[in-house]
């Protein structure tokens, strides 16, 4: 979904080399609508629902982080479907980040978080969740990456061109962060508290401190990662560095 038609045209004309011409792919269907409105009014279900709105202090964006929104997402996911959500750590504070994550984790108790900062100090995160526990087979993932040159190329541009590099961005899960989130206030439609939490901190850059607090609670659940012994040894060395 895209709410502004000019954005679609700009992406087609100016960003085709970056998005690999996805808008001209016959498999691509662009829906010109507010994404939440579309989910609320369609009967269609999806394998993946990804939400990458503008920062939650911008008016309206916090509605894509509410408990009601996540209930709607759950209703539109197919069995085994995955939801991803952007979580900024900059221009915000710990209260806002906690609100975002706790609200998501209430709806998806097996959610995981992944760090997008190559320095591993924290800048923003991607939360990934589904209805059931997740596990990641390193051997199978590496095979898929090698068999899909377009995917491999895209990941390589971000220095994530292997299963080891990709899975090394793992930053925690709902269970390990439960203590840190104990005082979190949930974001709901009636108040949109997240919008005001984030707005009060838009001139702050506490991303490294917030991420350090999250890392203090870091752990890897048993069975989350599988693969050959040498693959797992390399992964755990990267995760615990």
Predicted features and spans:
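The AdoMet/dcAdoMet-binding core of the Class I SAM-like
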Residues: 1-101, 105-107, 113, 120-122
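Soluble small-group transferase modules, centered on the S-adenosyl donor enzyme superfamily
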Residues: 26, 34-36, 41, 113-241
């Amino acid at each position: 979904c895209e709410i502004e038609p000019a954005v679609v045209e700009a992406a087609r004309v100016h960003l085709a080399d970056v998005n690999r011409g996805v808008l001209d792919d016959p498999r691509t269907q662009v829906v010109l609508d507010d994404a939440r409105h579309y989910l609320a009014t369609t009967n269609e279900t999806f394998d993946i629902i990804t939400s990458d709105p503008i920062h939650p202090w911008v008016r309206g964006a916090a509605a894509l982080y509410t408990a009601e929104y996540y209930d709607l997402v759950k209703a539109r996911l197919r069995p085994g479907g995955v939801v991803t959500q952007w979580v900024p750590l900059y221009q915000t504070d710990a209260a806002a980040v906690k609100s975002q994550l706790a609200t998501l984790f209430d709806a998806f108790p097996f959610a995981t978080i992944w760090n997008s900062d190559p320095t591993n100090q924290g800048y923003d995160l991607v939360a990934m969740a589904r209805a059931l526990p997740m596990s990641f087979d390193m051997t199978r993932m590496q095979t898929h990456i090698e068999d899909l040159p377009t995917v491999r190329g895209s990941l390589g541009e971000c220095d994530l061109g292997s299963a080891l590099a990709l899975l090394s961005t793992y930053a925690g899960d709902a269970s390990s962060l439960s203590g840190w989130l104990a005082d979190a206030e949930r974001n709901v439609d009636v108040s949109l508290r997240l919008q005001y939490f984030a707005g009060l901190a838009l001139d702050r850059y506490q991303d490294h401190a917030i991420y350090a607090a999250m890392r203090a609670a870091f752990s890897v659940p048993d069975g989350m990662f599988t693969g050959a012994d040498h693959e797992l040894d390399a992964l755990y060395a990267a995760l615990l560095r």
